[in-house]
A protein has these predicted regions:
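Basic polycationic patches enriched in arginine
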Residues: 4, 21-24
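HhH-family (HhH-GPD) DNA N-glycosylase catalytic core used in base-excision repair
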Residues: 25-213
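Intrinsically disordered, low-complexity polyampholyte segments enriched for Lys and acidic residues
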Residues: 3-9, 17
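Generic low-complexity, intrinsically disordered sequence content enriched
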Residues: 19-20, 185
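Intrinsic-disorder-associated, low-complexity terminal segments enriched in Asp/Asn/His/Tyr and depleted
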Residues: 9-10, 25
Length: 213
């Protein structure tokens, strides 16, 4: 799905971390870094967002919504509808979406600017409520992610992340959680090591780089 299959060919090889050691994750060495730069739809996302850490709650919520909605569809389709998602989901305001009622659900399911799938719409509302709850338990979504980045002293792998997400969130299978975390720097593999975007991201010291294996 998405970055994994849109012009991408994941080989399952391992990424060399900044320290020169091999990560133990089978990560994506894809051609996304070949075709996305300069592409009118993929280019800006590839160059400035994919793999770039952020702590902004609305941005994290947006990324989760987009990754969930991409399931079964192309990433290009989702990027083209991004403005529609922003309008439909109150600018990705967690508090607003968390209070959506049945009338809001019906509005979303009738909106051609987004993906009109009941399970995905319900997941967005539930996940907004889950994120809001994380403010009380951990201080916020970003703090929750940071608190669970390590497992037994090493970088938490995708399988462990999926188990954790499923305790609080809906529609969070392996591919969705993996891409969500990779896109935010919690897992390695968003870019090839020779990609200029990778070189820029390294300077930001994403979580996966802070805890090389």
């Amino acid at each position: 799905a998405g970055k994994r299959q849109e012009g991408a060919n994941y080989t399952g090889t391992c990424l060399l971390t900044a320290s020169g050691r091999r990560a133990r994750y089978p990560v994506a060495m894809s051609t996304y870094c070949d075709f996305a730069p300069g592409h009118p739809v993929h280019g800006p996302y590839h160059d400035h967002e994919y793999g770039v850490p952020t702590r902004d709650e609305s941005a994290l919520f947006e990324r989760l919504i987009l990754e969930i909605n991409q399931a079964g569809l192309s990433w290009e389709t989702i990027l083209k509808k991004r403005d529609g998602f922003q309008r439909a989901y109150s600018g990705f305001d967690v508090d607003a979406v968390a209070t959506y009622d049945d009338a809001e659900r019906m509005r979303l399911l009738a909106d051609p600017g987004i993906i009109r799938n009941r399970l995905k719409v319900d997941a967005a509302i539930h996940n907004a409520q889950a994120i809001r709850a994380l403010r009380d338990s951990h201080g916020g979504f970003a703090d929750w992610l940071d608190a669970h980045a390590l497992l037994d002293g090493t970088l938490r792998d995708r399988a462990a992340w999926v188990k954790l997400f499923k305790k609080s969130f809906r529609f969070t299978g392996g591919e969705i959680v993996g891409e969500f975390l990779m896109s935010l720097g919690y897992l390695p593999g968003a870019h090839r090591v020779d990609c200029p975007a990778h070189q820029r991201i390294v300077k930001l010291k994403p979580v996966w780089m802070q805890h090389p294996l």
